[in-house]
Amino acid sequence: MDFPNLVLSAKNSIQNVDSKDEKQKIIDQLISDIRGQNDGVIPDEVLSEIQQVAEINGLSFNYEKPVKQELLEQPDPTSVLSQEVFQIRTILSKTLFVDVEAEDYSVYIPDETSNLSPVQIDARPIQTYQPKALMYKDTAILPSNRDEVSDQYGADEILFDSHMFNDISQAQIRDFETYVLDKAMQIQSSLPNLDFVSSLDKEVNPFNVHNTLCLNFGQREYYNIIADRTNQSFQQRRQSVQFDNVVVDGVARRARVSLRLHPFDSQLLDIIRFNTIQDQPLADTMAEYQLVAADGFVATPRFRTDRDARLIADVRSRVMARLCELSPYFHRTRILSSMTDFNSLWKVNVFSSSIDNAKDAIYRMAEISFTVADATTSALSSVNIASAQQTLLVLLNMSLFRFEIEPVGSQSNFGAAVSAALMLVVFPTDEASMSNVTFDNLCNLVFNELIAWTVDRPTFVKRTGMTNAFEANVNIGGGNMTRDITAYMRFVLLRRPWAVFQRTYDDQYVADIMVPNIDEANVNDQSYMAINNLFSGLIQAAQRNPNPGRQIAATSFRKLLKSMKDSCCNRIMPLIRLMKYNVERIARIYRFFPYTADLVQRIPAFRDERIRIKVPVSGMLSIALGINKSPDVFDWYNLLRFADVIRTKNFAERQSLESIMVQALIRNDINPARSRKEYIQQNIKPATNVVASITKVPSATFTTILSDRMLNNEIRRTQSYIVVNRIRDAVRAAFEHVPTAEHGIAKGALLLPYPQNFQRSSVYVRKDNILYNAPVGVDRFSLDDLLNGRFYQGMVNRIQNMSPFVIAGPLQVRASNASAIDSVTSAYLTMSSPYDACVKPEDLRHNRIVQPPIVDFFSDSSITRPNTQFEQLMSKTSVFVIDAPKLIVQSDATVYNFDYRDIQLTTSVVDKLEFTSVKTPDVTLFNGMLVFED
């Protein structure tokens, strides 16, 4: 099939006709011919050429590649796999865990879903840049002023075209700034984002075989045009091309390339350095990873890294940080997402499959027979593995995050009371970490279930001003209230906070890492002593009291206490070591953490906005009874992969959130009546659940958030905002300096009270009504002012006084050809009428211009028309269109300097490292202490 020849002949036919309809017919015929000969499919090698022809001439061309749909076989309708099943999704809620003691569970079926669209990091080096101004050949016309002598064609010249502005419509003229913004966003989406060249399309210079030509950046078209040596017009250009060359410096990794570019393209190439993907050296991060993994692993690079190997930067969006401060819901969603990420990292497999053996041993020691159905057998009923694991995860997460805990589960039995007594020692009880209500409830539970009955005191009931049982009873001595019990109560009432393990380096992004302020080696640490004191005091009091247990027989109660003392006092230290083991290792990747900030220090009101997590009351006792082995050793490969994932996630979240915020902000700056909120909600493409959650913020709240001055300032500091604004400036400047009348848009118009003869704006036309500069001394009116009713009376006054004036601003033009003027049609009538019939009655009623006026544009470039006196008489116009001159492609090339190297950008570091395990047989802390000793 000879498709290229078909396209070539269609190109020539399109150039030979003037009207847009004829051109469209030719291209439609071409497409139908090709599809008819090729089973309805357009081959790829021809498709790009047709698209280019259509784009240059402003023609419409839509083609979708056919997709083959094949169904191999029908699924089995009886199969379990093909039946409809519920998909249970994780929900964003303030409650993180399911209550393990509840008898019935809830399954959440989502009533709405949010579609996530991952951010594609598309690496585009400089040579992928597609020039916006293409080149074409035009021929000068030498007009004749005698009827018997026809016009002649003169020398050829190569010009830049302006097809990049062939998509402005009447609606976009009214809102020209938005059109410029859309154009800038469109350019930014395809603008190179790597500030170097990775390859060049080169060819031997035919005019100087010692040099090389670069065919990228649309230069191939230029060299094709001047290659015709029979065309003497380009002799000078061919001599200049002898000096075109590509010089590559392999040591400095630079390339010097000779190019001829439109100033607009040159400006966009300068903007590329602001649009680059933010990156950092790969070698530095690899060295950091190797140091982190040095605990039990040896990480060696798989291959040597080049000096230009880069890694996407670990960027933390300032816009997201400010949004978290403004919206507690967004902050909680982000914290919850981070917490979910962390849960899989902790090493908590320290329990055997069941605690029943430990419970049986305790029951046997207490001589409790299972045939007796009394409250004794339910004393430890709520102790189980699920509670232990859940509580352990909460404890570990508390070291990285700050949240509120809510004790749940049965709070009226012996096991819950013992567990609460341990919680008061291990958990942080200071006001900043635990609310007063939770603290009081735990203290009251311990007092009422364990202490009051044993020491023969009345149970405590909350009253106004006296809510804590320990405060009420700590100073009342005598009776069976021994010093040991009082010592425990005093210790708890100190409300000791956890110790700081590592201070935050940025309190807007991460919180301090905290650990229990309990020694992991010294058995005489006051926390262990406090628990010991409590049990010693209780055992002593129970021996003197004939009925010490509230619901349990006296002998069983005393024996239960003794066995509890052994279990609890001995198992708290392994728990503290286990926490230290986890925290000190995860803290090594502190620099790569996800968002864990606690904003209470910055905004005190956020104290009530923390996530609330349910903790089983019996959890601490479950841990104490269940912990019976060492955890797994840390796998640094997974931990460092986690760091890679978080880096990529931060990058994607920043990209997807900031780009939409910038567009919404600029649209609102252009027209403050436009809603930023609606634009964001309709157009956001969330990369993660966190970004998607912004659309769930209530409407009025979201409006308030978006009006925050600090948030808007952060948006204005983003890379995306800077790039879009620079491209907008370049597009505006390009519009002012390229000819656009041929695409139906002019820069302005000079309106006259009486017709004048046509003039000739350039050597490429016989005559037209284009002016490059408005005459000096003529009043100018801005279209924007007139649309808003400013200075409209002044314009009417000029018309009444028969004075010429200029309307400056993008105006739509109505193209008229020469035959329409000849035949005295409406085009002739409007062009020769005063002011081009500019003033409409509707405008006078509104006292402003309601619709931007459409002015007539006439251009005659046909040399076949004779220069008759009749034509001279008719060719007058009262409107002159203001446009820019055509830009000639420079003869001598400009030398551009680019970095020249391979694309070595990566998102993952662990793939470049090889991990060799050299772990010791025992799991130890960094100070060499065993985590679990039998």
Swiss-Prot record:
Which residue windows are transmembrane per the record?
none
Which superkingdom is the protein from? Viruses
A GO molecular function annotation here is:
RNA binding
Q: Keywords of this protein's UniProt record, alphabetized?
A: Capsid protein, Inner capsid protein, RNA-binding, T=2 icosahedral capsid protein, Virion
What GO CC terms are in its UniProt record?
T=2 icosahedral viral capsid; viral inner capsid; viral nucleocapsid
Could you tell me where this protein is found in the cell?
Answer: Virion
Does the UniProt entry include the keyword Heme? Answer: no
Q: Does the entry feature the keyword Cell membrane, yes or no?
A: no
Looking up InterPro entries in the UniProt record yields:
Rotavirus_VP2
Family under the similarity heading: Belongs to the rotavirus VP2 family.
Query: HAMAP family this protein is in?
Result: Rota_VP2
Described purpose of this protein according to its UniProt entry: Inner capsid protein that self-assembles to form an icosahedral capsid with a T=2 symmetry, which consists of 120 copies of VP2, with channels at each of its five-fold vertices. This capsid constitutes the innermost concentric layer of the viral mature particle. It encapsidates the polymerase VP1, the capping enzyme VP3 and the genomic dsRNA, thereby defining the core.
The record's note on quaternary structure and interaction partners says:
Homodecamer; each decamer is made up of two conformers of VP2, called VP2A and VP2B. Interacts with a VP1-VP3 complex. Interacts with the intermediate capsid protein VP6. Interacts with NSP5. Interacts (via N-terminus) with NSP2.
Protein name (database record): Inner capsid protein VP2
Q: Which species is this UniProt entry from?
A: Rotavirus B (isolate RVB/Rat/United States/IDIR/1984/G1P[X]) (RV-B)
